[in-house]
Amino acid sequence: MFSPNHTIVTEFILLGLTDDPVLEKILFGVFLAIYLITLAGNLCMILLIRTNSHLQTPMYFFLGHLSFVDICYSSNVTPNMLHNFLSEQKTISYAGCFTQCLLFIALVITEFYILASMALDRYVAICSPLHYSSRMSKNICVCLVTIPYMYGFLSGFSQSLLTFHLSFCGSLEINHFYCADPPLIMLACSDTRVKKMAMFVVAGFNLSSSLFIILLSYLFIFAAIFRIRSAEGRHKAFSTCASHLTIVTLFYGTLFCMYVRPPSEKSVEESKITAVFYTFLSPMLNPLIYSLRNTDVILAMQQMIRGKSFHKIAV
């Protein structure tokens, strides 16, 4: 950054979760295990969806993209974090910090609207089952994932530009384990009012708008389920939504604790703990939640283990 009072910033220092060398080695093992489980679980989910003919439906199409986003999401932060656990120089380049910040915002927003698309899919499946094939056609499904990717990356790029347009001086120590907006803003020595307002508006809008779509979809879904006379029918209809509802609750619950508030020293410290959950645990748990609660996925896994599901990969 250019300023008459300081030199160009070329790198930042990530303070991470702790400065205790012994604890860092323990955390390295813990987060490495979480990362490997995340990669294995989500890659397995993508492989199952692409190779098993019974999973070639809109619901699993969206789930495959959710798994892909979770892999990118975790991979954006974890490798650098693991490196810093074992390194004395806990630095990240200016370009690397910009990229990490951009990808983090972009992938979070993308996941918002993929989860919203999944809710719409469940709404159509339960409330309009006779029109499901036409209303959730391949073209519509492609649009429902393409738009979140495009919008997410445009939002991430614009928000990152606002952040890195700020002048940074004095300490360049980021009080976090990745390049997050709130602690970066606290390092700035230029006016941050526009950036703070933009962050609050964008985070608030995307959280509330995507959650509104999900809640409205489930309002109609529950109304339709309660009209089903048989208990078995109600249970079967609700079971198709249970995994998605669990993921939505975990993901949105933690994010609401972090971004819908102005940045402060206290909020940054709290957000580090919150961020551990949705950056590492949520991507690891998502495929497990769908696997344990979904008979189609369990059956597909059994078929894959027996070597019966490796047909031609669907395009």
From Swiss-Prot:
SUPFAM superfamilies membership: Family A G protein-coupled receptor-like
Domain of life, per lineage: Eukaryota
GO terms of molecular function: G protein-coupled receptor activity; odorant binding; olfactory receptor activity
Localisation: Cell membrane
Alphabetical list of PROSITE patterns matching this protein: G_PROTEIN_RECEP_F1_1, G_PROTEIN_RECEP_F1_2
Disulfide topology: 97-189
Keywords for the protein's UniProt record, in alphabetical order: Cell membrane, Disulfide bond, G-protein coupled receptor, Glycoprotein, Membrane, Olfaction, Receptor, Sensory transduction, Transducer, Transmembrane, Transmembrane helix
InterPro entries for the chain: GPCR_Rhodpsn (IPR000276), GPCR_Rhodpsn_7TM (IPR017452), Olfact_rcpt (IPR000725)
Parts of the chain on the Extracellular side: 1-25, 76-99, 161-196, 259-271
Membrane topology field: Multi-pass membrane protein
Alphabetical list of Gene3D superfamilies matching this protein: Rhodopsin 7-helix transmembrane proteins (1.20.1070.10)
Glycosylated sites: 5
Cytoplasmic side: 47-54, 121-139, 218-237, 293-315
GO cellular component, as recorded: plasma membrane
Transmembrane feature ranges: 26-46, 55-75, 100-120, 140-160, 197-217, 238-258, 272-292
A biological process from GO: G protein-coupled receptor signaling pathway
Family to which this protein belongs: Belongs to the G-protein coupled receptor 1 family.
Function statement: Odorant receptor.
This protein's name: Olfactory receptor 5M1
The organism of origin for this protein: Homo sapiens (Human)
Gene this chain is encoded by: OR5M1
